[in-house]
């Protein structure tokens, strides 16, 4: 975590840490350390995809994660990201539940097709609002480039490994108003275990 903090501080980068509940329960001191410097948001309790759950199960999962994080940090949790960006067009009800639970900022919209979900019809490339059944919630979507009519996501996770660096740099520089990138702690862990003989695959 110290390496992540150092990089954020040296680059003067704002960050929200979306924390999984069971990890917070296992490492509460790390969560308190994060909360002393940055916003802590919910990443659910058990990292289950939204569309795999009923409304009731999703509400219970997120509610328990919020309560746990608030108990650990002493701060109100108002930010959320769905595991795998798994709020699809058909799961708009999730925003209604999040709003009911006190979430005011979401970062779950993946404005392209995605293995775990995605909202290809979402057209805003900058922070905007999502609406469902009369509720409005601030949305910070994943950044994309429009190429040949398709939304191409590039600013996070495995995309940092798949997209050539020159292209990453070019597209990043072409986002002067808003750039949201996401990483997992393991992405910066030089000691992350590697699969044997992976280089030969």
Language-model regions, residue ranges each:
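Short, hinge-like loop/turn segments at secondary-structure boundaries
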Residues: 33-36, 58-61, 96-99, 124-125, ...
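C-terminal domain-boundary segment and adjacent tail
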Residues: 9-12, 162-201
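N-terminal regions that are enriched for targeting/export leaders
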Residues: 1-6
């Amino acid at each position: 975590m110290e390496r992540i903090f150092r990089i954020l501080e040296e680059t003067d980068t704002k960050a929200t840490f979306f924390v999984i509940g069971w990890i917070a329960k296992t490492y509460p001191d790390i969560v308190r350390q994060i909360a002393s410097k940055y916003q802590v948001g919910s990443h659910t309790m058990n990292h289950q995809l939204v569309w795999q759950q009923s409304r009731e199960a999703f509400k219970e999962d997120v509610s328990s994660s919020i309560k746990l994080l608030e108990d650990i940090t002493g701060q109100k949790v108002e930010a959320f990201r769905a595991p795998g960006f798994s709020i699809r067009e058909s799961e708009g009800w999730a925003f209604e539940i999040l709003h009911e639970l006190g979430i005011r900022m979401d970062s779950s919209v993946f404005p392209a097709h995605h293995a775990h979900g995605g909202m290809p019809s979402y057209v805003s490339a900058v922070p905007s609002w999502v609406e469902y059944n009369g509720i409005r919630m601030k949305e910070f979507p994943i950044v994309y480039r429009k190429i040949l009519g398709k939304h191409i996501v590039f600013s996070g996770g495995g995309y940092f490994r798949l997209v050539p660096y020159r292209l990453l740099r070019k597209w990043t520089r072409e986002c002067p108003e808003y750039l949201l990138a996401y990483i997992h702690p393991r992405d910066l862990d030089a000691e992350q275990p590697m699969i044997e003989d992976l280089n030969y695959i």
